[in-house]
Amino acid sequence: FVCMRLCSIQDNRFAYRKNVLPTSMHPSQAALIVSLAKPYLKETAQIMDPFCGVGTLLIERAHLVPAREIYATDTYGDAITMGRENAAFAKTRINFIHRDFFDFRHDYKFDELITDMPVRNRQTKAEMELFYERFFDKAAEHLVSGGIIVMYSNEIGFVKKQIRLRVEYRLLQETCILDK
C-alpha cells in the first residue's frame, strides 16, 4: 500500500478566478456540475446564466463544451465587473449584462440556461415559491423548443413543484451534490 501526498504539484486549472464574492460557487463545484450535465450540453449552443455572479459556472461550461454565444445577467453590478475580469483571465467570451433576469429581453432564444439559483435568506417560503414560479415562466420565454435548464438549487421542492405543474418541462436528471 503506497500513499503519496501530492501537495507540491501546482494546479493552475482554476487560476482564472481572480475575483470572488461570498456567494460565489467554487470552481471545482461548477466544473462538477457541468461535467454531470455534459450528456445534455451541445456544441455551439447559445447559453445564458440568469444569476451569473462572477461567471464561474459559465466559464466552466465553456471550458467543457464550446459554445456559440454566452450571456450572463445579474443585478449586482460588482459581480458583473468581477465576472468580466474572470472571463478575460479565462480567455472566455461572455456578454455580461447588469440587469435583472426578469426584465431581460433578447432577440433570439437560448439552447441552455445554466445557473446557481439564489439561496433563500430572509425570504419566506411563499416568496421563494413565487420566485421559482417567475423563474420557470421567464425561462420558458427564453428557451428554444427542446432547450435545457442546468440548475443548481438547494430548493428541490420548489423546482419539482414547478416541473410538475408545467407540461413544457420534464426532469431529465437529478443529482444530489451535498446532502446535509
Predicted features by range, described:
Residues F1-K180:
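Class I S-adenosyl-L-methionine-dependent methyltransferase catalytic core
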